[in-house]
Amino acid sequence: MEELIVELRLFLELLDHEYLTSTVREKKAVLTNILLRLQSSKGFEVKDHAQKAEANNLPAPPQMPLPEIPQPWLPPDSGPPPLPTSSLPEGYYEEAVPLSPGKAPEYITSNYDSDAMSSSYESYDEEEEDGKGKKTRHQWPSEEASMDLVKDAKICAFLLRKKRFGQWTKLLCVIKDTKLLCYKSSKDQQPQMELPLQGCSITYIPRDSKKKKHELKITQQGTDPLVLAVQSKEQAEQWLKVIKEAYSGCSGPVDPECSPPPSTSAPVNKAELEKKLSSERPSSDGEGGVENGVTTCNGKEQAKRKKPSKSEAKGTVSKVTGKKITKIIGLGKKKPSTDEQTSSAEEDVPTCGYLNVLSNSRWRERWCRVKDSKLILHKDRADLKTHLVSIPLRGCEVIPGLDSKHPLTFRLLRNGQEVAVLEASSSEDMGRWIGILLAETGSSTDPGALHYDYIDVEMSANVIQTAKQTFCFMNRRAVSTSPYLGSLSNGYAHPSGTALHYDDVPCVNGSLKNKKPPASSNGVPVKGKAPSSQQKKVETAGGVKRTASNAEQYKYGKNRVEADAKRLQSKEEELLKRKEALRNRLAQLRKERKDLRAAIEVNAGRKTQAALEDKLKRLEEECKQREAERVSLELELTEVKESLKKALAGGVTLGLAIEPRSGTSSPQSPVFRHRTLENSPISSCDTSDAEGPLPVNSAAVLKKSQPSSGSSPCRGHVLQKAKEWELKNGT
């Protein structure tokens, strides 16, 4: 019987893992009940027999044993569970239940991934959120880890805080006295953020669609708002009620019109909120930051919400229907600390921004700022209290360029050793950072003298112009004089109004004369003329009127354009040689074809006629192949000539030492090039008493210097091709 009971119990346990129909499940339940009854009755019989045998064998005890006192049943919420021995998983969270009088604080644990909560898409609907909320509730894990945090707290809960780019992060929010304390975890002893509620205004923004949340926006004068997401309307009203009670304990004045009860307010009109967007100023770059201990919200989200001000609160809050409850207490305004201030509107040039930094062969985006002649790299704009790297800039050298894949890259070198590799997002950003770094490193290098080998001419001009203007602004803003401010060779080192766009032109006698030379066609400011002694040396050596300042000004892109021009010239020479050899071969083939035709006519009717005809066919096939090769060669040569013409046209601007091939009728001949350099606005400004030649339009000079013929080059090329094909068909 006992063996049958054991086997039956094992069989029922096996059935628990199988799929059963409703009828079989009912039969299984009946068998289980019978088996339990049999086991219970069998157990009582065995126990009675054992007690009787023990009573017969043992002597009588001196006294009756005390009956066992059953342990009192304790509810699961009577005491805190023990701390886990192993470390908590990475995605472990604790969600606090709102604290009520006479109740112990509770929390909800969940192990969902934090990345899912930080997603900016917010695509979970209300039903999914309700399903996730059904989790086991129990007390805080330990008394020393959590009870001190919520001791004397008016309300506490885990709320979502909006970060920049619309991401959300979970914080433990506790209101004690008149302060809002935010903890990253319930085990932290120090709050991550502390916000005094005095002088703040709070706005409740209800959920208007399934993709948004119930939000509480707490705004303090002079700082960006703190946006917290609550789970429901009831929870928002509870927080508003507690905050109102906290206001009553503040020392500041309370405006009765600014604190209506939550129950009397109706939903906010969305159109009315969007109507008053102009009263809210978005953040400088559309991103969040941390100022004065208050985490700012995203710039895009900030533009969609109305920012309540003190003047509006007194006159319009009572008229606006909805859940918007503005509470302003006191006039205290806390100024942001200098450590947390990233940029100021009073600065001419912002010395901070995001850059890509090359670290361990990987590019990472970092928030970079220049302070006290140091380049400080932060992991994020919101984390300014800690930094990753601090690089002293004095004595460093700024070198633009890294490779062709990263054209907007610049490097910092100290004693020839690479200190940092940075990449900007645009040419303006690159020029701004180069100007800032040149000014902070104490370098007297002109931004135009640097080599920009991986960007084109137009982008190089933009980078140089922005770098020079930034360099001037930084030097003008500096309080103390630097060694590179007094250099006369670098006009952009003088913090004057003229230096923003033009150089201070040094004269022969050593005095400075603010003479505005004409700007070039591409908008790049023109450098001044060097002393006459240096000019004579340049004219004697090169035969072209070009000053040293000019050569230094337009040195950007020189290596790249020179290499392109040389490559095109060598390719043109190679194609011309191939064309000449092909022409000679075609002439030889035509002569052989003519001789073969004459030989066929002479040997008509003979045995050698067939061999001669086969040879003539092979010769004609070769002639066709050579002719097709000549046509493709002509097209390639035309393309190379056009590219070379463009490169040489840019050579005038860049001051290249490349001369066109002799014997060509190109408008870039040495004589024309000499005349263009003398008359163009790129040439040096004459500082002598005699008036120099007036600057003329370079484009007009190029247009007038084109060879005037009855037909255009394109038309002549087509006529030449037609004539060649007619001659070929005729032969």
UniProtKB/Swiss-Prot annotation:
Phosphorylated on tyrosine residues by SRC. Residues 152-248, 348-442 form the PH domain. It comes from Mus musculus. Residues 558-649 form a coiled coil. This is Actin filament-associated protein 1. PROSITE patterns: PH_DOMAIN. One of its GO terms (molecular function) is actin binding. The gene is Afap1. Residues 595-638 are annotated as: Interaction with F-actin. Keywords: Acetylation, Actin-binding, Coiled coil, Cytoplasm, Cytoskeleton, Phosphoprotein, Repeat, SH3-binding. Gene3D superfamilies: Pleckstrin-homology domain (PH domain)/Phosphotyrosine-binding domain (PTB). Residues 271-284, 721-731 have a biased composition (Basic and acidic residues). It is found in: Cytoplasm, Cytoskeleton, Stress fiber.
